[in-house]
Amino acid sequence: MPSAKIYYDSDADLALLSGKQIVFLGFGNQGAAQAQNLRDTGIPNDKILIANRADAYADDAKAKGFIVEHDFEKAAAIADVLFVLIPDQVQPKVFNGSFVPHLKENVTIVIASGYNVLFKLLEFKSTQNVVMVAPRMIGSSVRSLYVKGKGFPCFVSVEQDGTGNALPVALAVSKVIGATKAGAISSSAREETMMDLLAEQALWPNIIMLFREAFNVLQKAGCSDEALCYEMWMSKEPAEIFERAAEEGFITQLKHHSTCSQFGQLRGALALDGVAARKHFEDTLYNQILSGKFSAEFSRLEDGLEKEGDENPLNELYRRADETELAKAEKRVRARLAGLLQ
Ligand code: NDP
């Protein structure tokens, strides 16, 4: 496979943003971090507008000295660059309903996740730029790394080049929020969404299932709930393993384990042919994700996901997950060892 192109600060020209009106739709996790980074890089405060409903997020933006607009239509009409930083599931309703009819013909729309673009849930005019600048970190890290003078991993792509200069603008946008400092990786909404959704819908479900079944087998073999919870995750050993994997290498980190553990892990992993897992991953990727089946189902559930109690389908899934032996045992252990866990 070809290597991805990596863009650095020297590839981007901030002059492209000079005099442009920047609008942030949303001042949450990513919005608050990216708006502050952008202002600290030198965009004047009077060229930044936070579009947000009148509530705590808007109050936070005002407290941080930003100009806030509650009327989305007014905000849309003046935007040269629009960052869409509200949750993915509400973007179609808010963006298509309140922004699309009022946006400039040559606006650059910046998304931080590929989902709604890949599944064509947002409406764009062919003259508009659509670019993805997608940090691979939560907002607090996007901000704290910037403050420390460091970069953060980020994907960048052009999804629609309406003006003919979408890539330079995407790179300027990446630089101004601090994303090209460590190198922004050229990607696409398709790639980003495939990786995100496959991890969410197949990789992590398998990991949850493997922990659940290992727990069940060991519990049946006589291990105590306390010992199991600590051994398997409360000691934070899995977190440490993944941290080492990120820092030193996915396989290299094994060298920190005992010889017996290294032998057991490598021998065990190489003996598993992975055929069933591969089939499951391929089926999820092609028949559930790329076919649009999941996205259609999720869109249908959208209203329910805002509801309280039993009517919310997510709450029903939590209820079922809480009935597993692993979850029930953990609840007992946490209640009993509350002091130890603080
Ligand atoms: P948040 O959940 O933090 O967004 C909160 C913001 O969205 C607030 O300003 C909130 O304002 C606004 N909002 C929520 N609901 C509505 C609504 N119905 N109408 C108008 N505004 C609304 O989002 P994130 O920052 O987590 O995500 C933003 C984008 O960034 C998404 O595309 C996400 O995939 C992407 N992303 C997120 C990452 C993360 O770490 N969370 C990492 C990388 C990308 P109010 O409720 O006041 O209206």
Where are these regions (language model features)?
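Rossmann-fold dinucleotide-binding core
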Residues: 110-197
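A short, basic/flexible loop-to-alpha-helix module at the beginning of a structural domain
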Residues: 2-19, 73
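Rossmann-fold NAD(P) dinucleotide-binding segment
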Residues: 72-121
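NAD(P)-binding Rossmann-fold cofactor-contacting core
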Residues: 25, 33, 39-64
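Active-site-proximal catalytic alpha-helix in oxidoreductases
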Residues: 164-222, 226-246
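NAD(P)-dependent Rossmann-like dehydrogenase/reductase catalytic/cofactor-binding core
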Residues: 223-342
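A short helix->loop->beta-strand "cap" motif at the edges of active sites that frequently abuts
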Residues: 43-46, 103-107, 126-128
